[in-house]
């Protein structure tokens, strides 16, 4: 039987390669940081989600070691059997305090948090209204739920209002949006979303994965940016991006919502608890962010500097308030060739093209970090200009 299936898979894989969509893994041989070793060559890393530059932070590494020494390597259990240590509860409280919410529940990843949030809370009597560019984990989570589904074009408030009007027959309604959309780097118009939610009696959920640690005066995410702390019912997020870059997801928000997720959210009920090392480092990370805004402030300065230099050089950059800078090239092959040439010059980035982004919208996604020095940013801009001229993007 496998012979026929193998042949089918080989044919599918070959089709993916012929379409130029086959993904290969580039192997890093160093810690994740602003300068990394790839294929025995040092590169400047501009494609990690390491927004606050904490992935190799010595204080977090020591906290992880300490937690492992004191609490062990792993939990060998789900939370409700025997997988809950006091440090798990302490991390949940730290997250709630950071975002100004009532309670928090931890997951193995934010993919699980988004995948496990809808089915326990909503039924066929309810409606989920989702932005068209929401993350794949939200899309999959919505598919697992029997609620009526509505979708509006990215950040289009007229379409959102139309969906809300059509959903008035449902019992409960929830608007779901990414805080920052990962491919364009644009922020959701959360002020308008919350205004419409109040008018049409809807709940609001925001995925803070690319906005937490980045947006707002102190980096507390899109709710801080719009002065809406405590106004959003559900926030999801990750420890795998700005917050140290390891692994782990969370849902934080209204107490009763979190309590129901503890009872019925399947990824929470049937997945091992986060290991003590990750939890211990997470607690220490939030202590660091409470003590100082230096990492966030440096990130803001770096993003402003990079964007200014790239726009002055003549590149087409998507407007954004986030740390994601989408350098638009439009052609899929050009984006791949551009990224390959940059790597030869010691700049580690990735070209994105269909089906990750719409056809004709290929780009290089540059992710700026607080860990980048001014010299590294200048080197990146210079390499972009050089390759841009070589490939005819710049005159």
Q: Residue locations for each model-derived region?
A:
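Conserved PLP-anchoring active-site segment centered on the Schiff-base-forming lysine
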Residues: 117-136
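N-terminal "arm"/small-domain region of PLP-dependent enzymes with the aminotransferase-like
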Residues: 9-11, 15-73, 202
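Active-site phosphate-binding strand-loop segment of PLP-dependent enzymes
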Residues: 150, 154-206
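Conserved PLP-binding catalytic core of the aspartate aminotransferase-like
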Residues: 297-306, 311-346, 356, 360-361, ...
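Active-site C-terminal subdomain of aminotransferase-like
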Residues: 200-203, 210, 215-321, 334
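PLP-dependent enzyme catalytic core of the Aspartate aminotransferase-like
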Residues: 3, 58, 62-66, 70, ...
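Short loop-beta-helix segment that forms the pyridoxal 5′-phosphate
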Residues: 78-84, 92-116
């Amino acid at each position: 039987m496998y012979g026929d299936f193998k042949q089918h898979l080989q044919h599918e894989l070959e089709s993916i390669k012929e379409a130029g969509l086959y993904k290969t893994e580039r192997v890093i041989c160093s810690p994740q940081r602003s300068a990394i070793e790839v294929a025995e060559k040092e590169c400047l890393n501009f494609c990690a989600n390491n927004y606050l530059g904490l992935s190799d932070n010595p204080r977090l590494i020591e906290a992880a070691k300490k937690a492992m020494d004191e609490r062990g390597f792993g939990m060998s259990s789900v939370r409700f059997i025997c997988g809950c240590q006091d440090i798990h509860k302490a991390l949940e409280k730290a997250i709630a305090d950071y975002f100004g919410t009532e309670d928090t529940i931890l997951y193995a990843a934010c993919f699980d948090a988004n995948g496990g949030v809808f089915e326990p809370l909503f039924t066929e009597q309810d409606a989920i209204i989702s932005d068209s560019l929401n993350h794949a984990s939200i899309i999959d989570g919505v598919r697992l739920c029997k609620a009526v589904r509505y979708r509006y074009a990215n950040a289009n408030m007229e379409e959102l209002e139309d969906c809300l009007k059509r959903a008035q027959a449902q019992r409960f309604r929830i608007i779901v949006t990414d805080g920052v959309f990962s491919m364009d780097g644009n922020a959701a118009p959360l002020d308008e979303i919350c205004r419409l939610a109040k008018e049409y009696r809807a709940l609001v959920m925001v995925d803070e994965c690319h906005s937490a640690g980045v947006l707002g005066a102190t980096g507390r995410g899109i709710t801080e940016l719009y002065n809406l702390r405590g106004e959003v019912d559900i926030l999801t997020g990750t420890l795998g991006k700005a917050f140290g870059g390891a692994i782990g997801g969370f849902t934080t928000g209204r107490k009763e919502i979190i309590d129901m997720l503890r009872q019925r959210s399947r990824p929470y009920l049937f997945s091992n608890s986060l290991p003590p090392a990750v939890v211990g480092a997470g607690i220490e990370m939030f202590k660091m962010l409470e003590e100082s805004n230096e990492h966030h402030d440096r990130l803001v300065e770096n993003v402003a500097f990079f964007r200014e230099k790239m726009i002055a050089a003549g590149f087409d950059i998507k407007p954004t308030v986030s740390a994601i800078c989408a350098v638009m090239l439009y052609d899929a092959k050009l984006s791949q060739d551009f990224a390959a040439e940059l790597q030869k010059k010691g700049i580690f980035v990735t070209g994105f093209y269909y089906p990750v982004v719409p056809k004709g919208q290929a780009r290089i996604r540059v992710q700026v970090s607080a860990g980048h020095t001014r010299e590294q940013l200048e080197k990146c801009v210079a390499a972009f200009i050089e390759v841009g001229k070589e490939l005819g993007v710049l005159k």
